[in-house]
Amino acid sequence: MVFRIASSPYTHNQRQTSRIMLLVLLAAVPGIAAQLWFFGWGTLVQILLASVSALLAEALVLKLRKQSVAATLKDNSALLTGLLLAVSIPPLAPWWMVVLGTVFAVIIAKQLYGGLGQNPFNPAMIGYVVLLISFPVQMTSWLPPHEIAVNIPGFIDTIQVIFSGHTASGGDMNTLRLGIDGISQATPLDTFKTSVRAGHSVEEIMQYPIYSGILAGAGWQWVNLAWLAGGVWLLWQKAIRWHIPLSFLVTLALCATLGWLFSPDTLAAPQIHLLSGATMLGAFFILTDPVTASTTNRGRLIFGALAGLLVWLIRSFGGYPDGVAFAVLLANITVPLIDYYTRPRVYGHRKG
């Protein structure tokens, strides 16, 4: 009898990286569809720009490194990076912004570290943060959902705004951002933070058109529920583990509830946190990145909980309305430490 000697791991996941990435791309369809419905064609244009930029940037670096271009591009990781960045930025952001952010994400945040599996930080979130810090006005210029918008740009106007900055009739972002109350609109999280700092009461803030949704912000609640649906499908397909999304959402909900109970005049209610911004996108599609997240089950719970706490702290007390990207990157920093203290004990090895 022949005994085969091999190093660990002794159990293997038969799914290839490309298939897992493809499952994540498919799971993003509900979220993309919801953003298209409420915010127009811009999301689709940004996805196309980001996808092409990601593939070209990755191909260029692979060519310079004398590595197989076709084999690496087939893993779909570049496409996923581009998609996650594209759905995170305003749909009418200038074309060069998504190109710049995607190229930075792929070349600097991913390939500079050695490529897929070597990068310590989520590339899409690195690209997003670079854009947010460099171009804060453009990165916070979201359109109002169509249900409260005065001007809804068509496909041609969308293309013209993205590539030239104005519509065929001469309209610009200022006119497109007007809501039914005649006031330029922002996201629910941005509106809440700005209004509280301006001295408005929570009761007044909740009367704004942006909060006319059944559960939370108009449009944004359905976008988050769509990303949640995609995330649940990923769990059902066993493409991701449940530990990170659950601990993230539970921690965020717990912190938001406690904060709201103790300070209802200054802090947002839990449903605003859970169903606004990039909450569900972050929980199921960004934090669960297998390369930059913790690799142990206990570590995943800690990692998700830490990210949830950071999101609430940044949203409630920080300078930015949504803290998902910063929370992800800060949590990424702690992964080596978390994995070190949560690694499974070797069989037969005693504690201490």
Swiss-Prot record:
GO terms for biological process: electron transport chain; transmembrane transport. The modification FMN phosphoryl threonine is found at residue 187. It comes from the Bacteria. It is an enzyme of class 7 (translocase). One of its GO terms (cellular component) is plasma membrane. Keywords: Cell inner membrane, Cell membrane, Electron transport, Flavoprotein, FMN, Membrane, Phosphoprotein, Translocase, Transmembrane, Transmembrane helix, Transport. Its cofactor is FMN. InterPro entries: NqrB/RnfD (IPR004338), RnfD_bac (IPR011303). The chain crosses the membrane at residues 20-40, 42-62, 89-109, 123-143, 214-234, 242-262, 267-287, 301-321, 322-342. Its EC number is 7.-.-.-. It is found in: Cell inner membrane. The keyword Ribosomal protein does not apply. It is a multi-pass membrane protein. Belongs to the NqrB/RnfD family. Part of a membrane-bound complex that couples electron transfer with translocation of ions across the membrane. Required to maintain the reduced state of SoxR. The complex is composed of six subunits: RsxA, RsxB, RsxC, RsxD, RsxE and RsxG. This is Ion-translocating oxidoreductase complex subunit D. The lineage of its organism: Bacteria, Pseudomonadati, Pseudomonadota, Gammaproteobacteria, Enterobacterales.
